Amino acid sequence: VYMGSSVGEQRLSTDVTMGLAQLSGSQERYFYYVSMGLSNSAVLLNGTRHHYCVPVAFYGGNYAINQRHSLSLNGLYTHTLFDPSNKNDMTINTSSFEAMRGNPDLAPLKVLGNTLSYNGQLGKARVSVSYDNNIYFDNIVHRFDADESTIFNTRTNDGTFYGNMLSATCSYFLLSDRLRISATAIEEYNMLRGNEYDLSRNIFRLKASATYLIGEWTVRLNYCSPYTTLDIREPYLVHRRPVYELLASWNHHSWTVEAMVHNPFGRYDRRHVTMDYGCYRRDTWNYHEPEGCNVNLKLTYSLGYGKKSERGDTEINRHLNSAIMRNF
């Protein structure tokens, strides 16, 4: 058991100012929106001030080819914010041989993200295909270096991350629409290019479900295949095990009873984390009991209230009311 202390005082304040101009329009078959402007982050760390002025943009649109097929595109260009845990000027020991070292020169991470998707219906089959592309400029990673007795962990801006994900989902109805079978195939290719890391990973996983309706009963089976993903936060590789679920629900008037069995073949959800950082090699097993074998039972009674009225046609919200930047 490690017991230690660090003495120091850090003062960090961040003021964000952003101005946006928006343009939107719509016709019978399409709508679009574009919101662009500038964001300035005024950061004061221990009496030293930095200004980070970054352009921001949010845009998108949808086109209805006909009543059964549509295309949509949504994108953004924005940046992260800071908190005292990643922008400071301190070194804190976390164990007898490990220490977290702050980086006062840490700069914002810029994100360019685009999602292109298609939704359609072919007879009793419903098809959805989407492509997600994300680029992280000035990507923030963990740099590890060591002296004779300590391994130091420092967050730093290094290189660019390229994330690509192609997913396709097909749902089909059988037995007079009482049985629905759905399958989703996901293919990812992620790259991390920089001075500290030069990594790439091809990832494929499959999700499938079968839902059967009989009277007031619903029974559903879910499955997700095992896969290995590249987590860019340090970075590291995470090896995930398959996931199995069985759900049954009963609905009668205002009563609903749901029972679910999650991962019945193992008490724990096991995740294997590996990575070679040069000065040390990470190889750990994480066991999560809440995501392992468990049984959930839920009982719901719905109380009707308010005045009933016929619902009209719903209109797609074509306006961008707000934009939320993320903490890294």
Specify the residue positions occupied by each region the protein language model found.
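Exposed, low-structure sequence patches enriched in small/polar residues
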Residues: 1-328
